[in-house]
Amino acid sequence: MFGLQHIWDCILQYEAQLRSPFFPVLFSITVYLSFCLPFVLLDALSPKVELIRRYKIQQKASVSWTMMWSCLALSLYNHVVYIFPLSVLHWYWRPVSYLAEAPGVLRVVWDLAACLLLFDFQYFVWHLLHHKVPWLYRTFHKVHHKYTSTFALATEYSGAWETLSLGFFAAVNPMLLGVHPMTEMLFHMLNMWLSVEDHCGYDLPWATHRLMPFGLYGGAPHHDVHHQKFKSNYAPYFTHWDKLFGTLHFE
């Protein structure tokens, strides 16, 4: 409790900046690119370094700078054209309020798990529908499947509808569950990290799916199969929904 309170007190020193309508967009872009950067370096080095290349899921696939810039440009475009205006509307309609007291550690862990599990379910339903209904796939989701070999900067390579609808789930869940603002920030960071890791294209020894037991979590190999085959592994993170609906495949 003391540690979290100290961190939260430090964050609240910048409360004026946190209340700015620019903050959500800058926070999202900064965190996202920070998480992508290590994998961009791996992509740049893997053709020359066998030690890195051995962890690449699709050994023969390569990532060009043109592909990276294309993905980065679309991500920045979506943030500026769509996310920022919505951030301004949210700032006007529902001003952010910050509690002085930090949450307890156990409460943070519980709320993070709840937000993540709820998002995982919402994403699964959304994703399944956008693959099973041809019009939805062609109109909205096909752009995300331009690349059949995943890489980190392809995480946010998507059209306006996909960006906004999945962003809506991520934004509304902390409000629905009534979590602390600190937990909400942590959830957005965790959600972005897991999404980038899903698309990174590497099966690293310390990856989340290797740390979580009993095959509960799919990770990068799980999502890479989805980008190759299109008709399986619809849940973004956990495997229980795909197991239940018979859509879980390992290769």
Swiss-Prot record:
Q: Where is this motif: Histidine box-1?
A: 126-130
Q: Which reaction does it catalyse?
A: cholesterol + AH2 + O2 = 25-hydroxycholesterol + A + H2O; cholesterol + NADPH + O2 + H(+) = 25-hydroxycholesterol + NADP(+) + H2O
Q: Where is this motif: Histidine box-2?
A: 141-145
Mark the transmembrane ranges.
22-42, 69-89, 108-128
Q: What is its main location?
A: endoplasmic reticulum
What EC number(s) would the UniProt record show? 1.14.99.38
Q: Which GO terms describe its biological process?
A: B cell chemotaxis; cholesterol metabolic process; defense response to virus; sterol biosynthetic process
Provide the cofactor list for this protein.
Fe cation
Q: Where in the cell is it found?
A: Endoplasmic reticulum membrane
Domain (Fatty acid hydroxylase) ranges? 113-247
Q: Which domain of life is it from?
A: Eukaryota
Q: How does it sit in the membrane?
A: Multi-pass membrane protein
Q: Does the keyword Lipid metabolism apply?
A: yes
Any one GO CC term of the record: endoplasmic reticulum membrane
- The reply on keyword Membrane is yes
Example of a GO MF term:
iron ion binding
- PANTHER family linked to this entry: STEROL DESATURASE
The entry sums up its family as follows: Belongs to the sterol desaturase family.
- What the protein does? Catalyzes the formation of 25-hydroxycholesterol from cholesterol, leading to repress cholesterol biosynthetic enzymes. Plays a key role in cell positioning and movement in lymphoid tissues: 25-hydroxycholesterol is an intermediate in biosynthesis of 7-alpha,25-dihydroxycholesterol (7-alpha,25-OHC), an oxysterol that acts as a ligand for the G protein-coupled receptor GPR183/EBI2, a chemotactic receptor for a number of lymphoid cells.
Protein name, entry field: Cholesterol 25-hydroxylase-like protein
Identify the species of origin. Answer: Danio rerio (Zebrafish)
Upper classification of the organism? Eukaryota, Metazoa, Chordata, Craniata, Vertebrata
